[in-house]
Amino acid sequence: MPAVLGFEGSANKIGVGVVRDGTVLANPRRTYVTAPGTGFLPGDTARHHRAVILDLLQEALAEAGLTSKDIDCIAFTKGPGMGAPLASVAVVARTVAQLWNKPLLGVNHCIGHIEMGRLITGAVNPTVLYVSGGNTQVISYSEHRYRIFGETIDIAVGNCLDRFARVLKISNDPSPGYNIEQMAKRGKKLVELPYTVKGMDVSFSGILSFIEDAAQRMLATGECTPEDLCFSLQETVFAMLVEITERAMAHCGSKEALIVGGVGCNLRLQEMMGTMCQERGAQLFATDERFCVDNGAMIAQAGWEMFQAGHRTPLKDSAITQRYRTDEVEVTWRD
């Protein structure tokens, strides 16, 4: 019954998780929060991660009721993500692996989300909608790869929402996306915004540029409220995501859809995806913020699968990479 310790820190969340044979034993997390109207810089984020990571490690072991002797493998996020935060966490993972004399595993962040989603929901072979601040992909498993059927051709949907939040100076606590979701519930008017779907791919830069340019003017003239803009942006970008996911499901003949990534916590997105799945006679799987948002347990779970399949990452190959596509990884642990 191997136990795997996972380190995640590819963006403004840092987490340390422990997983043993499909059971999450611990999953503490911290978030680097900046002032309204601002984003988070790589260097500042890395400093935050370095300041809290050892406390999180101790917290995870205590919560799991384990010691270093009980851990069989150390997993960490190899990429994709922001360079400085990734590097700061990878250094700790390598150090711990050497001090404890444990094997090391570099995990693809995207695959961590997928494997955690499969574990928590019980989805068998779903079409995956992976939506976060740095990634937007529609994925399906085939022949030992997670194949990307569609994706953003510019910025991620979460990045679009985060940057819009800066325009309205919406709070980043607990996250701009969550606060947009709450404001959208009070929106009453649907403002027409650019809708850009190109086959299986989507584009969010145009809708962001439009709303950045028009927001203050529309608010000043009383044409709409901030809540209306939040509502309109959500409805438009989520409709785009539902469209390309349905197209992928039709192509694959899939009867399961799984939403993963931080934006996947959004209940309105889950509602729209659920309606689409119901109309197709399919089933929707999603998790709550404990497992949708970046966390250490997802890296531990993917690491556990890789460890069981015989994967190891030599120290010389453990450098982080900011660009690490989902379909680069050979998924040897699935049939």
Swiss-Prot record:
- Could you say what a knockout of this gene produces? Mouse embryos display primary microcephaly characterized by significantly shorter cortex lengths, cortex-midbrain midline lengths and cortex widths. Mice do not show a renal phenotype.
Q: Which reaction does it catalyse?
A: L-threonylcarbamoyladenylate + adenosine(37) in tRNA = N(6)-L-threonylcarbamoyladenosine(37) in tRNA + AMP + H(+)
- Tell me where in or outside the cell this protein is found: Cytoplasm; Nucleus
Which residues are involved in binding a divalent metal cation? Answer: 109, 113, 130, 294
Q: List the disulfide bonds.
A: none
What is this protein's name?
tRNA N6-adenosine threonylcarbamoyltransferase
Any idea which positions bind substrate?
Answer: 130-134, 162, 177, 181, 266
GO cellular component labels: cytoplasm; EKC/KEOPS complex; nucleus
Is Metal-binding there in the keyword field? yes
| Cytoplasm listed as a keyword | yes
List GO BP terms, alphabetically. tRNA threonylcarbamoyladenosine modification
